[in-house]
Amino acid sequence: MLKDLKLYLDRQATNLGHYILEQTLLALVGWIPSIVGIGLRAVLYGLIMKMDGLAAIEEGVRLRFASHVRLGKGVYLDQGVYLHACPNGIEIGDGTLIMHHAELHVYNFRNMPHSGIWVGRNSLIGEYNVIRGQGGVTIGDRVYFAPLVQVL
C-alpha cells in the first residue's frame, strides 16, 4: 500500500512538500469563478510555478508538477485546461491562449532525453487539443491550432 502511495505521489509532483502546496492552492482558489478567482490565481499560483508576469488562469485548471511550468506574460488558461509537466516541463510564451479542456501532457515514463512542450508567443491552442510531449514538442510563435488537434 505504501509503495502504491509513493508511486502516486511521484507522478503528481516533484516531492511531498510540492504536492501538498500545489494541492492546497488548487483546492483553496482553483474553483473560484470570475475576475476574483483569476486575480487570486494570478498572485498565488506564482508560489507553485514560474510566471514571467501576470497570467489569466480560469477556474478548473488542473496542474501537475506545477514547479516545471513556466507561463509568459499575458498567458490565458481557459477552464478545464490540464498541464502535466513532468519532467522537463512546459513553457508557454507571452500572449498565448490555451483554450478550454486542452491537455498539455509531459509524462516521460520512457526516459526520453528531449521530453517537454514549448509553445511560442501569441499562439493559440484550440479547444480539446491534446499535446503529448514525451519526444519533445516545439510550437513556434503565432501558431494557431484548431479545436480537437492532437500532437503525439
Model regions and ranges:
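Domain-scale signature associated with acetyltransferase and cell-envelope carbohydrate enzymes
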Residues: 1-151
